[in-house]
Amino acid sequence: MISLLKGIDVPMGFKLSTVALCAASVVLLSGCGDKAPEKVEVADYVATNRGYVKSPEVTSVAVTAAGELLVTGGALPEARVRLTSPSGQAYGVTAGSDGRFQASLPQMSGGSFYDLAMETEGRLMRAEGRLFVPPASDIGAPPRSVLLRPGASALPLWPQAGLIAVVDYDAGGAMAVSGRTDPGIMVDVEIDGQPALEVRSGENGVYTAALPVRGGLRSGTVTIGIRARDRFETRQVSLRQPSAERATLMGVAWYVDWAISGGGLQTTVVF
């Protein structure tokens, strides 16, 4: 079991929980700060008069000439979209008639975190995870942005992501990996030089794999190998036991320690 998801039984291997979370009331902060807070009902997935509605998503992140983050994504047509920083500052935009939205957001020192949600019929529908963007200044290259997902592998959002783009692990001994390759091909995964499993990449070329780590994870390092057709890549991951939320650059990789609902920390390593 993934021990960090307290109170919810989740199978080992970063399988997304199918347990429905109870609706709650939260206070939304207005982007300009001159409106009184409003209460809306929160739900991960809701049934509306349009049928079951897909949660909002981030599709790309770029850096503007002013040094801000230009976040592009999809939501319901003309829905009100909110991106909220850990401090509670919210930035609101309205999606177009095609559901596409863009928002310019300030960067934070040490890496930027934003929670994405949209309002629909008086409810706040949250995205599948939290956006993390390492500090970036090159307007000609997309930053190594990822969607952090509790109890699952993070999703790489930048188009130049490698075969091994992200590795996730937690104190309960679960580990997962994701990356980008050609669409619809088989991907072979190795752990410390030993074959582990085979998965298929999606239509966008992104694959995710929950790794069968026998005996759990211990302090030290683990080597992940990925083979896709004639390409092969390995990465070493340092296993740590974080005690607080933070993002740390170690060599070429960002180690992002972040809190998940129910308590505990999950570590996402962005290469």
Annotate each predicted stretch with a short phrase.
Residues 2-271:
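Serine/threonine-biased, Pro/acidic-interspersed low-complexity stretches characteristic
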